Amino acid sequence: MPMILGRIDRTAFVMTDEEWAEVNKGSDWPTFTGLACVIALTFGAITFFTWRFESLWIALVVCPLAVSFFNQVAQVTHFASHAALVPSRHIEMLVGRISSAALGYTLDGFSRTHLSHHNYLNGPDDGDRLWAVQRITRCHVLTTLLEDLFGISTGRRALQYYFDRQAKLRTTASNILLVVVTQFAILAIFHTVRGWEFYFLFYVLPLISLYPLLARLRSTCEHIPLCSVEGGNYWYARTFDLNFIERFVLGPAQQHYHLEHHLVPNASPRQLQKIRGFLEARHDLRPVKARSYLALAWNILWMPSKGVLHQQK
């Protein structure tokens, strides 16, 4: 199936040997170390403001920090599932399992559904179908966002990752135990800093409400078809030109290079930026960057088309 990436047909994208050699230059360890430091600092900031909590205004600081932390950890899980995090597969798997456990699910459950997302993007066989965009209307978008906000999608996601026979998941007891141990460790940290109730207020609540809502919003912006293409079914993906705040909260670890990720799924965060450079250097294939997630989301929700954003042919 062809893929439309910005304005690129996937079949037209072929990198030369020289370009691949340039992409593979360097080490992924510095990028991984930097990301690990950012994750640690973000979690440290969450615990600090939890410790200093005196009014609800603090929640306006903690909640964006929590969403950023979840997205950072999710990107670690994401790249580990693609074997694109660090050269050592053993370390990669260990870090990936711990990071996924911090989000309440297993690496195996995520990997199987997400990799089918790359094979069957937004189609009926997309194992990541909770975020898939197949037939979308303004009413449908708003309804699903409300489901995300009230934790309904989180429950469905858990059932999908742990018990979905269609995705052929194999969730072992040891993987579930790691999730339980990791969550108890996070609970212990919050209990030590301020109290166990803040684990539910500043960690669990954003994790099951704000995080899935914003993840849905981002995924919709990354993949929603905004135009009809004659001649068959197409996949869509796009890259975003984000400001610092959006990049920190919604698109950390090169998440915004989503077009390039679908072109080369096993590219590391460091390599995605180089691939983007090669795309922009080709005048015949130069893709268009979307301005921001929030700007595109606003246009999607209020696009004047009788409530129907897109109808695939």
Task: Label every model-predicted segment.
Residues 213-247:
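Membrane-interfacial segments at transmembrane helix termini in multi-pass membrane proteins
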Residues 84-96:
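Membrane-interface motifs of alpha-helical transmembrane segments
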